[in-house]
Amino acid sequence: MNQMLVPQLITVNDYTLAVPALGSAGRYARIVARAEACIARIDQIIDQGFTCSSATSFGKDSTVVLVLMLEAIRRRVEAGLYMPAAFVTNAQTGTENPAMETYAEAMITELEAYCTRLGLPITVVKVQPSMTSTFAYATLGRGKLPVFAGASRSCSVDWKLRPQQKALKQLLSTLQSPGELVTFVGTRLSESATRAANMRERGEEEAGRLVLNEHGSYNCSIIADWEMEEVWEFLMACEAKRGGPYRTFVDSFDWCLELYKEANEGTCAIITGDGGNKAACGSRFGCAWCTVTGERDKSMEAMIASAPEKHGHMLGINRFRNHLINTRWDMGRRDWIGRTTSDAGYINVTGTAYNAEMRRELLRYLLTLDVLEEERAEEHDARMFRGELERTESNEILRGSTFQFITPKNLLAIDFAWSLSYGFDHAFPALSEWYEIRVLGKRYLIDDVTPTEKGIIPEQRWFKFDDWQSPAQEMGLQDAYLEATNKHRYPERPAMRTIRDRFEGKERNIVYYEEADEMEIDPADAMCLVDSFDEAFYTLAKSLSPTDSAKFYLNKGLVKLAKGKAAEYDAMARRAQFWQRMERDLAGTDLRSYIRHHSISNAEHEQILESMKVEPAMQNLAISDLFA
């Protein structure tokens, strides 16, 4: 707190607290009163024995909450009061808006230095979503559709909320007698009608109230009743140059304000001077290609239009996002070969995922965007070195690549998923795409696609396996050669592993694999493999079956499977092999058309399932009649 403010005693939440005299806060008196009430509530929560955490994206709202928690903790430390360990979490999804990601990384560096300098017992935790929930694996690898407007935002839960809760749970387990966890969040009622309704449904409409969440810890919307203008006013109150009464982990939030201004076509600003026009900026930042926002991502478009010299390199990302939107209802990009097998021996025929062609197209686009960004950065750095560009702050930020969406780790995850999917012709299919773009110089620019109008999605149908045998007859992840050679190559470990067959329920030997709590790929191992993927590797891959690369990853321990999930991946491999064999046997007939033509309706399938329930009952009745 700025020393020029004379403390006074006020009562907040039934107890007395020394705070800056509001009269001496001048034009900030109103926001100081609001902030001090929040700080007092946080202090009270700490006094009650709770462990505190702030979940921040470094957007305007979560930054306010972070600063309030930091201020409460700083005062306790300076006063010599007991202060248990606290945490700040930041979710790094790998799909963030590059401008916001660059800003967040800079803020984390400043925050960690601030906590160290002041001796605050705060740990900054950077979390990532589980491998199987990432856009790279789930959408590019497995074909899961992105979350579009009108659907529940499962991406926010999978990519941000769940990883943060998991990380905090692990950290709390290392502490001696930790208190129950309270996470301070920046949700506000005035953000939107939908947000307000959701907050009321969860019981978060009262600022400072502790609300038990589904993870067994508490959420606290400490600024639930703040208006957007108050959010900006508080951030401005943290700057000495504006005469603000607070000091925090950065000297000013000008960078933050500038981002929001640019995301609102360069016209949005807040002026805190006397008589100034206080038009606060309320733009929102989503992921780089957030599809929840509807037909357009107005924030990113505005950033590119208002400051092309700073954000023009994100134009390709916006085109990628629009491509996802424009092809949403294109059923020709869907995979009509399902993944659910019924008790009657049928597999579902439903277009709820992208087909192999669409997944390959999307990967090509992102790989190309990554390469183009590297080329932009190299040219930018060269011009800086030659003195052709001024060494401004914005030019310094643009040095080096500002994004890489397809990292080696992501590439291996996609390659592993494709190796277990129908529609890919040879081993290491994703790595081959990488090689052709990175080494052979291919480029795939995103064309404008006429949006497909929303239509009626065909209902789910069912195709019977029996006519073409069954995936149960396929080899899947079995490999006699690896089983034989592993005994000599790796005598210290089992030559193979045993699982419970998903189709027949019997024990079954498959390739050796390692397990972890969830699917795991070591980034360093991934980088080494990608670097070694040369012309000979590329050529060899063309002569191997897709499943061979999956078995390679598992046998080498490059991909570790989630505990107890190996049988699922074996079943995936066998289904893919079954469809590949069926396609060969059809000798040119389109597989998807054949399956749909020879499938039955959902109603017919339900009748078959019902008859299966009746038959055992009739048999039992007949047996009982024999002994009547």
Language model features: what each stretch is:
Residues N2-A55, K60-A628:
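Nucleotide-activated chemistry modules centered on ATP-dependent adenylation/adenylyltransferase
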